[in-house]
Each structure stands twice: as C-alpha cells, then as structure tokens.
Amino acid sequence: MTEEEITALVIDNGSGMVKAGFAGDDAPRAVFPSIVGRPRHQAVMVGMGQKDSYVGDEAQSKRGILSLKYPIEHGIVTNWDDMEKIWYHTFYNELRISPEDHPVLLTEAPLNPKANREKMTQIMFETFNVPAMYVAIQAVLSLYASGRTTGIVVDSGDGVTHTVPIYEGYALPHAIMRIDLAGRDLTDYLAKILTERGYSFTTTAEREIVRDIKEKCCYVAQDYDHELEIASSQPAKIDKQYELPDGQIITIGSERFRCPEVLFQPSLIGMEGEGIHNVAYQSIMKCDVDIRKDLYANVVLSGGTTMFPGIADRMQRELASVAPSSVKIKLVAPAERKYSVWIGGSILASLSTFQQMWISKAEYDEFGPSVVHRKCF
C-alpha cells in the first residue's frame, strides 16, 4: 500500500454541513450540506435516470422539486438510513476512496446520548468495514486547531451550541454546558420575523434561502436596544437588499441583528435558559478557582454560527460585564473557525501518539459497539 492509500479520513458530521477530507491536510476536501432530498413529484420523463434520493449539493441544486431532510438534529442522528446515505456519498462520491482501506475519525457533540455513538461505531465497522475508527469531541478538536491546550471553547454550529472548558489538554466534563440552540433555530426565527415583513418562506427549499439570507446579511449588534432605535429612526443605515433566486429584491432591516440576538437572548424565541455569554460564564464558574483566569484569557469561538460579524466583540463585552473586573478576557476567533473542528481532527489523526488510540476492527469484534465508550473520551 502506498502512503496515500492508508491516510486516515476525518469526517466532521455537523447538523448542517459535512466536512470531510484526509488527515494531515490543512482544509477539508469536501464540504457539503447534510441533506437528503426526495422528489415531491411523479417522474414523467422516462430514461432521465431520476434517483429516489439525492444527497448534499445535488439535493441543494434540485431543491425546487425535492423535499429536504436533515438526518442530524441538534447534533444527534435521528434518521440512520439517511445518515448512511450521507456517509456513502462522502466516501464514494466526494472523497472517491474505499472505506475498507482507511481508518476514520468521526466527531460528536459532547453530552450526546451513548446510543448515538454506539450506532455510529456499528455502521462504520459493519456497513463500511473500516479497519479502525475513533469518535472525538468537537470542541476539543477546535482547541487543537487553535494551537492551545487550555481554554474554553464556545462551539456553535447548526444544531447545537456547547461550551467546553479544557485545561492542559483535559476536558472538564462536569463543567461542560450544552444548549440546543444554534444556527437552525436562528434560520427558523429569521423566517418567522421575515413573515412580519410580508415575505413568506415555508417549504424546506425556501428555508435554505432564509439560511443564505442569514449568512449574507445578519450581524450581531453591540448594543441591541440602541440598534433597534437606529433601525426605527434611520432605517437607511441598516436596510440591506437581498436578491431572491427568481430575481425579486427584498429589503431587510432590523431583522439583520434581531436574528442573531437570539444567541444572547433565547427568550426571543420562547426558549428558557441563558444566552451563550452566560452559559460560557457558568461553565467557567464550574471549574476550579485556580484555572478560571486561564480560561477567561482563552475563550475560543468555533463553528459556523460564530461567523456573524460583531459576535466576538459582543461576547467580550458580555463576559466582561459578569466577570470580576480585574480579570483579563481574551476572545480568540480564528478566521477558519467554520472548519476548526475538522482541522483539529486532521491534526489529531496525523499525530504519531494518536495511532494507539484507534478502535480496531478486532476490538470491535471482541467487545461490540460499547467499546467506543472505553476508548474514546
């Protein structure tokens, strides 16, 4: 076998996007939406080779005639058949390799149900016959990618947001906090407040348009109430145009910052619980008093939902208002934070010291799916 053939694969299965590639690379080769689409209409043109399901970008491009489903919700796989389709697509169509030849590193949100990772392990070994695999915690990988061993990672993706304090490479499980409030909830909320403007987005395909509006137009206000005043008194300062796929142009105003505000005020969507700044603070307060200072100085943002302009400054301000006044707070927001989980996985899987950590096929055959809890943090 040549060197290229036995490279480990790193697959970061997000609720919204799959990031996949080879260990040792500095960016994922394949990034596509975690979507499986099925036709909503009857096929009339025979011989066009219509499929009964489409995955990823192809589903996205044909979304006008498909019903789109995300098999991963809040970081937990809810539809294993569709998940298998996504993995199959990843191996054979995107990376164009055969999974029997490569160890696979998968990622998972912390505090996920145990059954979720057991089933992941089972499918990898039994359906795809991988020689070895490992399941890593997403936030830990993000910290690796930022080149630190100590810090608190605030990871917010499409399905789940979590804060994980890590000290000298050890995650502190008692202080991990998780909120099921993330990008997809923001998209839903944006769709709802756009309805008040008279723009209705109802189908699964139109939801994707809203997601695009969110990614292109939204930002985090430094002072929410002040921003609302500007929006009502000088709307021209805030209004932005967006062109829909059919050429219509819509104007969005205060929605631009009202949407991401949900991260700091979940009560806007009727969710009980604290904003992400408070969750991070509580996470730090659950740690030993001696290490808090180091955590405050290394708050690492990761995940696609932390890509809003202004989020780091706002987070810094919010943390400063609750933390002791003498403490120094530093936010780290790497430019590639959308992919930092994947990058961390790529680093981890190519370390020589990591090679003994893999769960081998032999171990799986001996112990069954529960081996994953013994070998993976």
Curated annotation (Swiss-Prot):
InterPro entries: Actin, Actin/actin-like_CS, Actin_CS, ATPase_NBD. It is an enzyme of class 3 (hydrolase). It catalyses: ATP + H2O = ADP + phosphate + H(+). Pfam families: Actin (PF00022). Its EC number is 3.6.4.-. Keywords: ATP-binding, Cytoplasm, Cytoskeleton, Hydrolase, Nucleotide-binding. CDD domains: ASKHA_NBD_actin. SMART domains: ACTIN. It is found in: Cytoplasm, Cytoskeleton. One of its GO terms (molecular function) is hydrolase activity. GO terms for cellular component: cytoplasm; cytoskeleton. Its main location: cytoplasm. PROSITE patterns: ACTINS_1, ACTINS_2, ACTINS_ACT_LIKE. PANTHER family: ACTIN. Actins are highly conserved proteins that are involved in various types of cell motility and are ubiquitously expressed in all eukaryotic cells. Essential component of cell cytoskeleton; plays an important role in cytoplasmic streaming, cell shape determination, cell division, organelle movement and extension growth. Belongs to the actin family. This is Actin. It comes from Cyanidioschyzon merolae (strain NIES-3377 / 10D) (Unicellular red alga).
